[in-house]
Amino acid sequence: MFDIGWSELLVIGVVALIAIGPKELPGVLRMVGQWMGKARKMASEFQGQFNEAMREAEMADLKKSFDDIKATANTFSRDNIMTSLQKDVDAAMTIDKIEHIDTSPVEPTTPEPPTAETLLEAETHAASISAATAVTEVGEPLAITQEIHPALPSPEPAAAIAIAPIKDAKAS
């Protein structure tokens, strides 16, 4: 603490013995010891109060940080994506309730096959559009046209086709 070595303490002890005398030396040493005890006690109290103040300041900082995080979390929970997802899931769960509603079944309908008149209209419409604009736009509906089937040759009778004998690869 004071950076005093053993030799320096011995010199102080000899000077105190000569200056104070052997009769009063124990009382003086006791008083010096009490002063040293009081000084150490005051130093430890100061250090304890300083450490407590540091802990309180640190706790105040931690409390402030915690409050900031809590406020941020509250703003996220109000506009939370999970909240909107939960609402979507809840809405999807109501589909089960829709099954209990009495509705008459809808008859499926099939479109009528195209007639010669509708094919002719589609071809004239496609021709007028391709003449008016060279580039076809993406959003335009496709024209209905008649499929052209090539004439299929008549199949030959099965007797005319010569069947080659099947050979076993292992046998040869």
Swiss-Prot record:
GO molecular function: protein transmembrane transporter activity
CC annotations in GO: TAT protein transport complex
Keyword Transmembrane: yes
Transport as UniProt keyword: yes
Regions crossing the membrane: 1-21
Principal location class: membrane
InterPro entries: TatA/B/E, TatB
Location of the protein in the cell: Cell inner membrane
Any single biological process term in GO: protein transport by the Tat complex
Disulfide bonds: none
Domain of life according to the entry: Bacteria
Keyword terms of this UniProt record: Cell inner membrane, Cell membrane, Membrane, Protein transport, Translocation, Transmembrane, Transmembrane helix, Transport
Membrane protein topology class: Single-pass membrane protein
Family: Belongs to the TatB family.
Subunit and interaction comment: The Tat system comprises two distinct complexes: a TatABC complex, containing multiple copies of TatA, TatB and TatC subunits, and a separate TatA complex, containing only TatA subunits. Substrates initially bind to the TatABC complex, which probably triggers association of the separate TatA complex to form the active translocon.
Entries under NCBIfam families matching the protein: tatB
Job of this protein: Part of the twin-arginine translocation (Tat) system that transports large folded proteins containing a characteristic twin-arginine motif in their signal peptide across membranes. Together with TatC, TatB is part of a receptor directly interacting with Tat signal peptides. TatB may form an oligomeric binding site that transiently accommodates folded Tat precursor proteins before their translocation.
Listed name of the protein: Sec-independent protein translocase protein TatB
